[in-house]
Amino acid sequence: MERTDAPEPLVRHFTATGFLTHDGYTALHWHRLGKWLPPGGHLDPNEDPVQAALREIREETGIAARVIGTATPYVRGDRARVAPPVSIGIYRVPGDSHAPAAHEHIDFIYFARPAEPGPRPPLPVGDPPWLWVSEAELRAQAPLASGEREAPLPDDVRALGLAAIEWERRDRAGSGAPAPAAAPGAA
């Protein structure tokens, strides 16, 4: 007998997020989900998660960036490798342009800073609003507001934003993550 009450198969998409930081601030925008979020989005075909995170940062903010604060990748000979994310989140989302029904995003989360040194670059003006959010604002746990849009930060955005700022501080000081170690027996 065939079951008719079986749940629909779960649809999952791979996404990448880049917490863009500069001098004690992280960039967040008002997302259509009604939340303040960092730049991010779906991986394009043949794109690795680092490429996706950096592309999303550039597309959404206009700022070229580089990844910081990742764990030491395991080096295995001359094989290509991708920097590991600082975290991987799984988020249930409503329908979007990639799937009309609710689904999950498996999100590769990276920390990044502007590729070029200098003063904090301007963020896009308009809709959706973008903000450079300070470490003090993240620690205050007060809702963020821009115009008519106000909402508390999701706990993971607050925690990851603070961690990204700390990694950016270490990166500027030259005391970031250690260099990759070669695998035993690798040339």
Regions inferred by a protein language model and the residue ranges of each:
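Acidic, metal-coordinating catalytic segment for phosphate/diphosphate chemistry
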Residues: 1-17, 83
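Short secondary-structure boundary/capping segments
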Residues: 10, 18, 98-102, 121-123
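Histidine-centered active-site/metal-ligand motif
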Residues: 13, 31, 42, 103-105
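Residues embedded in well-ordered beta-strands
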Residues: 17-19, 25-26, 109-111
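Conserved Nudix-box catalytic region and its N-terminal flanking loop in Nudix hydrolases
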Residues: 22-79
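Nudix hydrolase/Nudix homology domain
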Residues: 34-36, 102-187
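Active-site segment of metal-dependent pyrophosphate-handling enzymes
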Residues: 62-117
